Amino acid sequence: MSVTSWFLVSSSGTRHRLPRELIFVGRDECELMLQSRSVDKQHAVINYDQDRDEHWVKDLGSLNGTFVNDVRIPDQKYITLKLNDVIRFGYDSNMYVLERVQHRVPEEALKHEKYTSQLQVSVKVSAPKRGDALPDHTPYCESSQPRPEKGDRRHGAEAVAYRTPLYGQPSWWGEDDSGAPSEDRHQEEPYSERPKDLAQQNGELDSCRAPAEPPDYSFRREPSYFEIPTKETPQPPRLPEVPTQEVPTKDQEAGVGGTAPVVQSHASFTIEFDDCSPGKVKIKDHITKFSLRQRRAPSKETTPVETVSAETKVADWLVQNDPSLLRRDGPGDDRHSTKSDLPVHTRTLKGHKHEDGTQSDSEDPLAKTASVSGASAEASGEQVRLQRQIKRDPQELLHNQQAFVIEFFDGDTPRKKRSQSFTHTPPADPKADKRRGPGTSDRDRPGVSVRATGSSSGPQRASSLKREKTEERLGNTSPVPRASTRSFGSVGRRSRLAQDFMAQCMRDSSPATRPAPEKTPPVLPAPLTPRGASPVTPSTTPPPPTDPQLTKARKQEEDDSLSDAGTYTIETEAQDQEVEEARRMIDQVFGVFESPELSRVSSATFRPVIRGDKDESSDGGMAQRMALLQEFASRAPGMAPQMEQQSLLVPGSPGGQKWVSRWASLADSYSDAGLPEDGPGRRTGEPEGPLPVRTRRLLPQLPSGRADSPAGLEAARRNGPGPPELGSEPANCLIGQEDLDPDSLSDASGSDGGRGPEPGTERQEDLAWVRGRRSPRAPGELVPTSFFIGDQNGEATFPKKSFVGPGEVDGPGRVVQTSPSARDGLYVSSNGRMVIQLRSGRSPEPDPAPPKETLTFARQESFTKEPTSGPPAPGKLPHISSHPLLQDLAAARASRLDFHAQDTHLILKETETALAALEARLRSKSADECDGGSTPRPPEDSLSGDSDVDTASTISLLSGKNGPSPTTPQTPGPQKESPLSPPTVPDPGGATPGSARERMSERQHRPTPADLGPGDTSRRAAMRRGHGSRGSLDWPEEERGSGLAHLPSSNHETPEATLAGRQGPRRKPAAPPPSPAAREEQSRSSATAQKVQQALTRSNSLSTPRPTRASRLRRARLGDASDTEAVDGERGTAANPEPANRAAPEQAKKLTRLDILAMPRKRAGSFTGPSDSETAPARTGFSGRSAELYSTSRKPTIAEARAAAKKAAATAANTGPRQPFSRARPGSARYSSNTRRRQQGSDYTSTSEEEYGSHHSSPKHTRSHASTATQTPRGSSSTRARSQGPRDTDDDEEEPDPYGFIVQTAEIAEIARLSQTLVKDVAILAREIHDVAGDGDSLGSPGPTRSPSLGNVPNTPASTISAREELVQRIPEASLNFQKVPPGSMNSHNLDQNMNDSRDDALTNKTRPRNREEVIFDNLMLNPVSQLSHAIRENTEHLAEKMKVLFQNTGRAWEDLEARINSENEVPILKTSNKEISSILKELRRVQKQLEVINAIVDPSLNLDLLMGNRAPSGSGQPGLGKARPAAQSSTSPASVDTLLPALPLRSFPQRANCGPPGLPEPAFLPDAERFLI
């Protein structure tokens, strides 16, 4: 009889049969259980329409949504699923493809009394039955024929098993009783994922799977749900015997005519009677190798054999299926179903069970246990092999004519279930056997084999994928690599006996051999290359299996990989699986997985790379598969050369970062599209890619060497001693990477990641070279990971896999895109989803591969600070990718840099253009991703939002690419030189490109207070300038801010000169393209970027990663503005730096000030780092996230974004320090902190760099720059630096004078407005920062109120009071030091009030138009605020250190602190018209006080060196604050502001000095501020 069955085939190849009833999908107690933490407990419902024979999916209002074809479906609304629809639940790395299979139940089987009774029993024990069927089916993945066969059996068994699950119970309910069915089902799920992936990758899967499915479906589905298959069913199935024989494809590829091939289940299905569970019958398609393999090869001609086989096989299976013998699936079956029934599966789930009781699909304890089976290692290995083969290689089983799988199930220890298979047929394929040689190994790394095979044969890939995985485990140890033709081991698999023997042998020998495969899959010995290594099989060769325990561990890992879907695969070696898994899951969640390579190397066992790939399960296997994939990029853990092609590893490749969290892998899971790009390697990686796709969400991998995801070229070039190593094509990417390199940790990587080699490949190569030489870390040295979130379209996708630099220390763990194109180095998902390029490395220069082009936003937030070991070549601008937009930006940036030297405004405009280009790239990527069915946003958010890593970094990367990236590569030397030599101004055009980068670098390296002497005004100005567009770490921006006042006069030329000099030296290497051309290019880029940004925004909004705590806090603070929304808006707005470009996004996504402010904050405030310039140092100091986020903050619409950015910059500056300290988040607060240091001047001045450079030109220009710089440059120093140019231009465009030098009045007005906005933003951000960062309890308390009312920081009583108190405290200090702008301060306050009015009409509309005084005052106020924030940050930092040292003292310290803080709060509110500023200052003061108290408490005697060091710089300001506080409180806002500015700079300066770069500019800032005020 023919039955139609619907299956959800997961990217891992696991097939889930969809019952004709409503099933729940979720993490807990659901019929379809996913392990991804992004999947809600009850995420979605899949219902069945009997009339139309179609399934519906309805999202149950899940947090992360359900995506059909990468489009998020509305909640609570049924969406009809069509054939081949791709469904994703939350950010589960598994994508499920809906497939339909027409299954014919073999007449023989149905007639068979035993079978019928078993079916009936199965119906009773539906769960077990289904489980059985599933595993059976899984084997079919190996070959299309086996798959149908599996389908047949599976249909019967699964149908019964999957009869109608009780509501709330998984359909496999009861499977655990038999254990085998559960295992089958568990396996099925992973396999389904894999086939689905395969299907996505190849049509093969469909073809292979479809036929398999049809038989499976018909047989299984009808009987299982509606009736116990009786003898009626057998006859129809019997008919399709011949067709069944043929390799079933959806098309019935083997020639089954038009009808779906009816796979006769005679050999297809095994009926296992489980003695353990009386009612349980497992119908498996691995009945006998008897005919399965034959059928497969001679699909059509197999009919006769099949006919005979049907009966024979039924009999054989009945014999074999002695419940005890065939109880292969034991608790392992639960693996598949473990997802829901914890109680039942507890034993089974042991070691795989997640805390929530879910078990990853690939966490098949049974299989693992089988491998490990203590009873008999051999039996265990054999069992694993057999199980894997059975599940995955039914055909192979059939191929071995008669394979009797006898499973010895240890009832007491399900995991110890051993299966022995006796094959009466001579070994069919030594290769297959080898491939499967060590059953356990193969099982351990199913992904490897599957991937390898997948590449070799499309059709097989789908069905084989899983099988191969199993096989790989089974046959890893096999000496002979599996033939490529037998993708999944269905080709020439040895007899079970031979395989078992091989498994034993391999087990004996594997311990020695396994490490090699782990390290160098490509180099694996032939035995080690059963799958991946064999040339036929493009995929990486599976590592040889190791001892049974290792095999078991590997098997578990494989299982874990399978469950990667939403779960964190935990690879367990021989260690306690539960413990290992728990650890790994935790690590994954935190993106801290040891590099798979490392772990692999460390553990002989091939540990699955936890990268969210199904293949991830087995490191070796995956690594091997990857090896083929990335043969050149062999990601062997042992491969020290980062240049190894590993960088080409597919993001999803097993080599991917282990650290990839499932969330990260989610993003990775969409790197399928990119995979194919690699051609055979890629293709090989394709299965890998999809698998990775499902799990691959790489969190930054610190330990691994830099992974330059771009092609190995990029990796090589990065690793290469010099630029020559870089390939010309990758060179572009390299530039991007290089751009990132200097500050790759900081925003530089991220922001610049999106930019292609703007000046040229040469520059990128230089950058790569410089980066290589400047980064001290050895090639093998781990590089800080950078995430690039990009799209295929926008090459800036996050390479899901970390791009392994030359060494690819990550090796297997860090899968780099296999695609040769370095630009696409970021692995792009086939869906066009952004791939996360995870470049992990300790090196401060994660050098996020820019392979993705502009879109590749390197996640700047590397976990390690990038030590700018060598000055990156100035020409080595951080061009993250060679994306055309980026390239355009490169030219634009070069020109912009020239403009920078020439005109800060132009630079700003250029920066905006660059931002626009980045945004365009992002948007285009986003669009592509959307088209591809993937959304870059989830990966971005995912990285940032899903993972503990702050979402800001990802968002910032996407949105701004945060200009810092270009700066990042800047050579510290050139940077410093640049500021040192204002004369470089003459070299604005030529030096500009270099200078921007150098500025960033400079900012990074310049942090030394000595670097920027107060006397070195020009140099300081230059620094400021450099920092301005990129956001300066130092106070240059602040100096700029103060300089803004005096800039027009004395520092006026110096800033420009310095800026030019600075930029010139920095960007000097980059050929300065004609500013007009560059600008045009940038404009184009901007337009494109806008689109990209919009697309990204859409994508982000479409599939946003699960919000992190910070994002939730932000959301709560922001109210309706959600993290994603804020980021999207921020991105959209910021991404459109140019007025036109910007207008659309700006208007389209008009962000409220709060939204804008929240954006950087939203991005965990990590990226709140003032700007790229800030980001670079910030990143260096912290992650780049704050800066990048900040960047994003500044990216909003020119006016709004500018103001908001200004505010955000100020606020971020305030927030940054605070947040970093309050919030331990490195990416969020710390980045912000450094950023804020630079930003304090720049943000508050808002024109630190821009105003500095532009102020000398013209107030208006300064104004524009201020806003733009604050928004854009601050946000993304390098990208922003580019953006700044464009934005400046935009500002200019907004204002008649393009350069803005002429229109001083307009600029002043603009400045006033921006200052107003900035002040408000600062207040708002301060509130939010307090809330989120919880810097101080006092801050935290006001934070919530503050956060909601962006404009009403002062309005909010708590926040206002806190802020005001802080202001009062600070302002008195400031007043004492500086009382020169009473009118300005008043105006500033008025302006601020205006801002408030704009935000809240409640605030009196004071002078909306601002005078220069007002603007200056605002800047001054903001500068103090920024400085205050910086001081707070410093204090907090020191405090944190001290507390670490003296945590035991914190108890009493906190009490004292509380008292002191409370007393501080008592400080009278500053009487200023600018309530926001007052509140901000007060809050900051309060926070600082808290920090001071904490410091005092921690080290009351101030004995600690940290304390002393902090006190010295911090104390200078703090004591003054304390003393000045009363005066400030009493003093009015003007005096307070005036006083505050000087005092704060002084105060902040010491702190900054402690911090390093920020401190340097501060002295200059004070003079600047004074001058400005004067």
Curated annotation (Swiss-Prot):
**Domain of life according to the entry:** Eukaryota
The UniProt keywords, alphabetically, are: Cytoplasm, Cytoskeleton, Microtubule, Phosphoprotein
Biased composition, class Low complexity, residue ranges = 370-382, 1134-1146, 1199-1213
Q: Which residues carry this modification: Phosphothreonine?
A: 540-541, 1289, 1345
User: SUPFAM superfamilies annotated for this entry?
Assistant: SMAD/FHA domain
- Which Pfam family is one of those matched by this entry? FHA
- Ranges of biased composition (kind: Basic and acidic residues): 147-157, 182-197, 325-344, 430-446, 465-474, 996-1005
* Name of the protein: Centrosomal protein of 170 kDa protein B
Write down the species. Answer: Mus musculus
Lineage, please?
Eukaryota, Metazoa, Chordata, Craniata, Vertebrata
